[in-house]
From Swiss-Prot:
Binding site for thiamine diphosphate: 72, 111-113, 143-144, 171, 278, 360
Protein name per the record: 1-deoxy-D-xylulose-5-phosphate synthase
Pathway annotation: Metabolic intermediate biosynthesis; 1-deoxy-D-xylulose 5-phosphate biosynthesis; 1-deoxy-D-xylulose 5-phosphate from D-glyceraldehyde 3-phosphate and pyruvate: step 1/1
Alphabetical list of HAMAP family matching this protein: DXP_synth
Domain of life: Bacteria
Amino acid sequence: MSKKFAHTQEELEKLSLKELENLAASMREKIIQVVSKNGGHLSSNLGAVELSIAMHLVFDAKKDPFIFDVSHQSYTHKLLSGKEEIFDTLRQINGLSGYTKPSEGDYFVAGHSSTSISLAVGACKAIALKGEKRIPVALIGDGALSAGMVYEALNELGDSKFPCVILLNDNEMSISKPIGAISKYLSQAMATQFYQSFKKRIAKMLDILPNSATYMAKRFEESFKLITPGLLFEELGLEYIGPIDGHNLGEIISALKQAKAIQKPCVIHAQTVKGKGYALAEGKHAKWHGVGAFDIDSGESVKKNDAKKSATEIFSKNLLDLASKYENIVGVTAAMPSGTGLDKLIEKYPNRFWDVAIAEQHAVTSMAAMAKEGFKPFIAIYSTFLQRAYDQVIHDCAIMNLNVVFAMDRAGIVGEDGETHQGVFDLSFLAPLPNFTLLAPRDEQMMHNIMEYAYLHQGPIAFRYPRGSFILDEEFNPCEIKFGKAQWLVKNSSEIAFLGYGQGVAKAWQVLRALQEMNNNANLIDLIFAKPLDEELLCELAKKSKIWFIFSENVKIGGIESLINNFLQKYDLHVKVISFEYEDKFIEHGKTSEVEKNLEKDINSLLTKVLKFHH
């Protein structure tokens, strides 16, 4: 099999169908090989190989906008576009991104779901205004159709009549099991040939029948369409082709050529198998969606077993315990049941915990109503995805001052997924909201205490915790959580103080321990609360320590530094504040330890900076 992956449209057109199939097989082999070493989105990419090849053959990637929703299906596109030589660096520091990025030659950035059709609509408008003959092509998975933004875009696209192709990759899975009426609707797809030939027969019959018979025939056609997969799209004004076999290159190429010739908005419904070509992944739901390094033969993870439980596992276990204790606890996740650990609760309490698919806005507002009715909702969500429901957080939770708990997973640097997934903004966008209380645990025991407190707390409350395990290796005595109270972990006469928040406490402790080995010292405070701050403790601290270092995994702007400076100004206190929070730029992908070193946020870099102020 050929190992040359980069192909122009002209080169692909010269290949026979058999050669294209061989190319697809080689692509799969390469993707499996690289992802097994680097980790990545495996099953979704394996399921979209033929779709991507056909896109590149029928359309011109140099001029036609190729838009990959979420870009979990973009690896084949990267290989076809000339990234073969650097594909081995996928998701590595300073290497190829696992998502689409304009800086790598892609049309648009993607990492969050359900944006592709809106982008296609905008591209259509721009192309029309410029008088150009280009056709946007959007590849979107069936899971993304659970988000409302898709229908906002389809509604306008169908009315616009711009040339545009929506390639719907229907693997009936999304990340976890499919959720909602739309998924069930697509799964009822009928055979393309039968549906298309039926439409043609009806059209011919309507031309020759008298008026009364024509009316009856139209009613019959409308009734038939109620059980066909194209109804949804056709009623929105889009042409519909399918369902087709998404692994049959001949079928896909033919459908794309047909859609291109229509010169109207067209949806091609392609049915695929997630994980196609790797037997261990075929037909699996969440397990092979996003993976770490693994052994190809056995499918077993090659990651060293970490004896420490992940923060997600701790959250899941604590919530199970709380839910068994308090029957008014309910919860929701937006298409991430296994990622957030809510799958265990959905399994045990299916009438109290729900996965609402990719619908963060709906998730938040629906839980607001449950809080209004006297329940205690826990919303389990990645920090980066809470951004998608910001208006609902303000309008439906904060203003109403409802008893809603936001459990923000993947806070801080998340590593290989890069800019679109780093959880470094939540403190900045939640802290300004009246009625909100913000906390972060430093370790497992404090996570337990904070969750107990969150249940009893009145008003909206959010706590953040990291991807992976808590890294604090010192067992400080846990404290009872009291509203707005911090904990003084290391107390001495040093003029230097370390203020840690969440995972930042562990970093502060590591730097402090290194200082102590040099016969130096510093005070160590676990803020516990970012809002409200413990003003009493901080006023006492300001009397003795005049240099404060902030350890927090959030951006500086709107982060702990901003909150501390507001406090100091309020009481006219004169303290020098040095923040080790993140600068005003997006953080790229790579292993967390390597990213931190690049940002000079590793322990050695932090220690060097602290020593400049130590006398």
